[in-house]
């Protein structure tokens, strides 16, 4: 699922109140209303805003708002057409996500089915007057977590981020967990709905091979792909973070220079030399966990005396 990472402020002097978006329909958020009602019954009190959206505080009385929970800022199931869509269709999808997100916050701020305390908390936030001045204070970028990707001779898959984690041609390391947001919302025969596709699986640091960003020789010999690289959905869910993009971009730049200077195709460069240059520049290719700290005197005493018993006469 895609969403907008919202920058909001709780500074009254800098805050723009949430407004009703075009074609607003409160029943679009019916499941959110039912979720809030269920949370109230379960906890015996009104839910807080952080229960339906992730709030990461940043300086200047602002916060980064992201998806959190089964009904939040992710517009589940509405991103499917985007990767292969025309530019016109992509604009439609973009605006649909915009109006959904505006409606999400307006619903929380205005709808009578939302507990009063949650409405008040939502209304304490708003778009900042001093951000995104050229787009009516709305974020410039839709969070496109995953879109079109190259399919090369080597496709990085789940095993490459979980079990087969060393490679002969490493250009960096990844360590972010496999993080897939929900893919679709399914209506079940019993009348309930179920979100499908969310995945949060920890991984150990793994090596990223040069091969992920070189195309098939039959398709191109002068192209390097450091973002839309050759990876499955599960592998990409871990690789799709900015630190990995920066590592791959650095390696792509060096590889391009080596290809030009040696007059070779990107598939034929000296990868050993590429890896060596990356190491010289400080790129980490191996992970060695830090040794545990030495035990304290208190911990040593507990360990030594754990199985020792004393008679009453001892005291």
Model regions and ranges:
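Disordered, acidic Ser/Thr/Pro-rich linker "stalks" and the adjacent N-terminal cap
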Residues: 296-315
């Amino acid at each position: 699922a895609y969403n907008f990472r919202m920058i909001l402020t709780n500074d009254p002097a800098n805050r723009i109140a949430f407004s009703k978006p075009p074609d607003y329909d409160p029943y679009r958020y019916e499941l959110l209303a039912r979720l809030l009602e269920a949370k109230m019954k379960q906890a015996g009190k009104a839910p807080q805003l952080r229960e339906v959206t992730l709030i990461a505080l940043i300086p200047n009385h602002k916060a980064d708002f992201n998806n959190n929970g089964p009904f939040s800022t992710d517009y589940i199931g509405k991103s499917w057409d985007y990767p292969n869509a025309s530019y016109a269709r992509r604009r439609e999808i973009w605006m649909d996500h915009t109006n959904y997100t505006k409606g999400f916050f307006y619903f929380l701020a205005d709808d009578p089915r939302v507990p009063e305390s949650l409405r008040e908390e939502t209304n304490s936030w708003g778009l900042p007057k001093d951000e995104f001045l050229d787009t009516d204070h709305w974020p410039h970028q839709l969070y496109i977590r995953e879109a079109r990707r190259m399919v090369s001779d080597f496709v990085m898959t789940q095993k490459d981020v979980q079990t087969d984690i060393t490679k002969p041609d490493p250009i960096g390391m990844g360590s972010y967990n496999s993080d897939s947001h929900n893919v679709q919302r399914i209506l079940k025969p019993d009348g309930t709905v179920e979100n499908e596709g969310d995945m949060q699986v920890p991984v150990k640091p793994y090596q990223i091979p040069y091969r992920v960003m070189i195309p098939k020789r039959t398709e191109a010999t002068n192209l390097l792909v450091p973002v839309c690289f050759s990876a499955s959905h599960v592998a990409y869910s871990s690789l799709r973070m900015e630190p990995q993009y920066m590592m791959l971009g650095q390696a792509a730049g060096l590889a391009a220079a080596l290809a030009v200077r040696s007059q070779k195709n990107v598939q034929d460069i000296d990868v050993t030399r590429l890896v060596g240059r990356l190491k010289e520049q400080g790129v980490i290719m191996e992970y060695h966990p830090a040794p545990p700290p030495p035990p304290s005197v208190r911990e040593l005493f507990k360990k030594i005396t754990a199985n020792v018993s004393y008679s009453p006469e001892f005291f």
